[in-house]
């Protein structure tokens, strides 16, 4: 008798640039490994050869794209990512942790660019067919603090070089998403010390682990 493989868990990390996702992603990787969780790690846009090419286009400061073209590119990359990486991992029982997912599109293209949420939702329904993360960790930080952290660290990409108002709209859109899906999105105050933030991360990971 063959036993059915239990579907893996899907975790996403979100936040404005400079919120510290990369630091916490490394912590999550180590924590899951210590607890015997078979997990794969990926990112958006990206995660597949085709999606990485789209990522390069989206982040290149020289790219000129209409609002709708930008949103469509994000979802084109996402569809390939889901088909090639996300769904196979989850179906095989692996946990999948992604640095950004659809909440980023609502935040950057919806909040930042002004693409209507309803238009993004229609693309989400078409591309994802009901797929949603089991847990989203939203690292929230005032935009001024985030800008200070980012200053001088590297050459800014197409989104990072946007004006302060753009990033304030992105943050507001993220918080709106959290209000709309409180059962999935955990808002973490990223202005605190790393140890305090990671203590909260552990609480959410433990709850997810207990759910099996």
Swiss-Prot record:
InterPro entries: P-loop_NTPase, Thymidylate_kin-like_dom, Thymidylate_kin_CS, Thymidylate_kinase. GO terms for molecular function: ATP binding; dTMP kinase activity. It catalyses: dTMP + ATP = dTDP + ADP. One of its GO terms (biological process) is dTTP biosynthetic process. The keyword Ribosomal protein does not apply. GO terms for cellular component: cytosol. CDD domains: TMPK. Keywords: ATP-binding, Kinase, Nucleotide biosynthesis, Nucleotide-binding, Transferase. Its EC number is 2.7.4.9. Signal peptide: none annotated. It is an enzyme of class 2 (transferase). Belongs to the thymidylate kinase family. NCBIfam families: DTMP_kinase. Phosphorylation of dTMP to form dTDP in both de novo and salvage pathways of dTTP synthesis. This is Thymidylate kinase. It comes from Chromobacterium violaceum (strain ATCC 12472 / DSM 30191 / JCM 1249 / CCUG 213 / NBRC 12614 / NCIMB 9131 / NCTC 9757 / MK). The lineage of its organism: Bacteria, Pseudomonadati, Pseudomonadota, Betaproteobacteria, Neisseriales.
């Amino acid at each position: 008798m063959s036993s059915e493989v239990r579907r893996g868990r899907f975790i996403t990390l979100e936040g404005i640039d400079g919120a510290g996702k990369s630091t916490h992603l490394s912590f999550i990787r180590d924590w899951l490994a210590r607890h015997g969780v078979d997990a794969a790690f990926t990112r958006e846009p990206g995660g597949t050869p085709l999606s990485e090419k789209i990522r390069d286009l989206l982040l290149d400061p020289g790219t000129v794209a209409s609002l709708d073209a930008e949103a469509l590119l994000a979802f084109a990359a996402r569809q390939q990512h889901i088909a090639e990486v996300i769904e196979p991992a989850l179906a095989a029982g692996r946990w999948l942790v992604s640095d950004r997912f659809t909440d980023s599109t609502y935040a950057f293209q919806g909040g930042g660019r002004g693409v209507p949420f309803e238009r993004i939702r229609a693309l989400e329904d078409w591309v994802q067919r009901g797929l949603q993360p089991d847990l989203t960790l939203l690292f929230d930080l005032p935009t001024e603090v985030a800008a200070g952290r980012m200053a001088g660290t590297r050459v800014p990409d197409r989104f990072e070089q946007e004006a302060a108002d753009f990033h304030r709209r992105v943050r507001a859109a993220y918080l709106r998403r959290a209000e709309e899906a409180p059962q999935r999105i955990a808002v973490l105050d990223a202005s605190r010390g790393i140890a305090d933030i990671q203590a909260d991360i552990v609480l959410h990971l433990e709850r997810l682990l207990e759910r099996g």
